[in-house]
């Protein structure tokens, strides 16, 4: 099981080109709704906020209602799936012509490049007004730019974080880890607590497993090296990637993730941490919102501390390097019948959800649009302070 876990970490990491953002096949049988006799059109929009407890899903629905009110000739039909199922479905749809999709949630940089190269997504340059351009945060669009064209606008950025349950650390007599060696030492002490997994991995969902390796690779190679690899300037052959793999194996060998890490997915790992059954979780900044809003959680949010990914003493990474950035957004299917309407909604929903992500303590908006900071939770503010130290 441990060997299979590592294989999954490495396979997912390579398949997604490590998905750092610092920096299926088959034919679709989906059908577009088309234009009605009264001139109303329906845009089919897909995203991966499928959980009703996710505040962003609610904010998306509010934004859609507002858009339909202001644009009575446009109706929005939404399809949602959990992240892994969503990725599989989208890839299958775009193996064909994806006629049943007008606007969809996706990931930029290397992930979207395959769709761009295949002519599957539409550039938005013709629909970007000077006013829209002026509201986008400087430096927030690089993951959406290909060959001088902009294929999406930013939504929000995120920050990979090590979340720690300080109460469990105190019970185990463990130090909050600032280095990899301290992380290993903490794992050994946390294992003495009955019924507690030192680090919840959620490895049944591949992207969760990949996060562990990505975190270590960032510290071994450094942000500059990783970005050079992602941009094609360097091969995936730096010795640091091998060292990160070896450190991942060591964490598996000392049972950091429990006895059978492949049995738990993302939701299981989140629940384990939120209910005091796991002492650590490596996750994006959006998890801060989960800790405060998940009704099933029993943990006291004040027990949780947000930390940087631990440093590696002889690695090339710097303490200001971080994994995250602006990479997730909505895109337009190049095969849509309603290019102008789809582009306008895409730009609109990216801005609305960017602001919503910040106001809910999930991410950092890619827009200068004023946001309400009055309800930001203390854990998210900790992450905000960590981000301010980053590059």
Task: Give the predicted meaning of each segment.
Residues 2-27:
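Sec-dependent N-terminal signal peptides of Gram-positive bacterial secreted proteins and lipoproteins
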Residues 11, 25-113, 117-118, 176, ...:
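Conserved N-terminal structural module of periplasmic/extracytoplasmic solute-binding proteins
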Residues 70, 171, 254, 295-361:
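Extracytoplasmic/periplasmic substrate-recognition and gating elements
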Residues 107-160, 184, 212, 240, ...:
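Hinge/lid segment of periplasmic solute-binding proteins
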Residues 123-136, 175, 203, 220-243, ...:
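Short, solvent-exposed loop/beta-turn-alpha elements that line the ligand-binding surface or hinge
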Residues 147, 151-155, 160, 184-233:
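Extracytoplasmic/periplasmic solute-binding protein
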Residues 187-189, 230-261:
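Glycine-centered hinge/linker elements that transmit conformational signals in sensory
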Residues 304-311, 358-391:
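Long, aromatic- and glycine/proline-rich binding clefts that accommodate carbohydrate-like moieties
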